[in-house]
Amino acid sequence: MKTIVIPQFHRAPSGQRGLYNRQEVGLARAFAALGCRAVVLYPEPGTKTMQTESPEPNVKICHMPAAAIGAQTFYKSWQILLDEHADAVHVMGDNSLGVPGLYRFCQKHGILFYSQLSALKSTSGHAAVRWVMDLLLCRNLAVYRKTPTFAKTPATAAELEALGVPCAGLMLVGLDTAIIPSIPGSRTAIRRALKIDENAKVFVFVGRLDACKQPLDLVPLLQAAPGWCAVIIGQGTQGETLKTRLTEAGLIGRCRLIDRLPNEQVHIYYHACDAFANLNENETFGMSLLEAMYAGCPPVARHAPGPDLIIEDGVSGLLCDSVPAMAAALDKTTRTMGHAAQSRVNEHFLWQNSAELALTLLNQKKTWHK
């Protein structure tokens, strides 16, 4: 049985225990379903001992001692790769500073190293940090040029080629359907249970209320779409500002703001709403977008690398250049579009596809390993 290790390099909420949508765990489940073992590594700065979870057979999650500098983390040892008898590491390291060290360890011990990347340039809000990270990126690029490197989106593939890194192909991000609950009942019944007007036109926004997600654009979106109400699920640094601006604009009565919900209830809102709004013009992928589409909730999204890849414009959703265009697009969403969105995810955006592609590399290990 092959063992694939999937390390996370960034200090991020996505790896916290109890959170439902951990991409690495979704991929691990897909590997297990194909007859492999998968070990997910999450960095835990400040801890001294490893703690583990075993959510299902052949899936192991290890919370590892690590050092941290800002969002960057560094594992104190890669010995776990030998302890777990790793055949390969599935690296989603992008510009992480720990990538070169992992590569050297794998090279020394004959472990296949390959990557699935979403972005390379720093997106830090601090110019000095961006400059330093982009300067240090050359270390990662040297590794990616020597190893099979896949892109999560066509935009990333183009970026890799521009930086002199041969792209081995697209390896798309997938949805972990094992964590998605079944939501029984009609939309009318669901709305009654949620106390949402059965006849209202309602879109849902799900995401962090931070600047990178552009949540403040919900204000002009609602102003330009007077016939619509919004369910806004999320919290973040711009949460209070958003609430204030909605109030000042006289829009707060058309909104339901929810800081945090259990996963099951988030999915209930996908089934209750007429459309899903994605405002981030730099969205590299969009897991909430995939979830909404899987529920049959048609998306209206700004053009960005992720939505441009996922949505077939006019078929499984609508792509727009601006907030006014998004407002107009809301009225063009249909149930048929929602069904097409659901089919789109089922056919192209499940983790099984990525896992199957990755396993082909293990059969070519001698060819790839350098």
Question: What does each of the following model-derived ranges do?
Answer:
Residues 197-213, 219-222:
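Conserved donor-binding/catalytic core segment of Leloir-type glycosyltransferases
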Residues 312-324, 330-334:
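Conserved acidic donor-binding segment of nucleotide-sugar-dependent glycosyltransferases
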Residues 281:
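Aromatic "clamp/platform" in nucleotide-sugar-dependent glycosyltransferases that forms part
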Residues 1-48, 84, 223:
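N-terminal subdomain of nucleotide-sugar transferases
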Residues 243-261:
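Nucleotide-activated donor-binding/catalytic signature segment of Leloir-type glycosyltransferases, i.e.
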Residues 298-301:
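Short hydrophobic beta-strand element within catalytic cores of glycosyltransferases
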Residues 260-261, 268-273:
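Short alpha-helical donor nucleotide-sugar binding micro-motif in glycosyltransferases
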Residues 130-131, 137-187:
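Donor nucleotide-sugar binding/catalytic pocket of nucleotide-sugar-dependent glycosyltransferases
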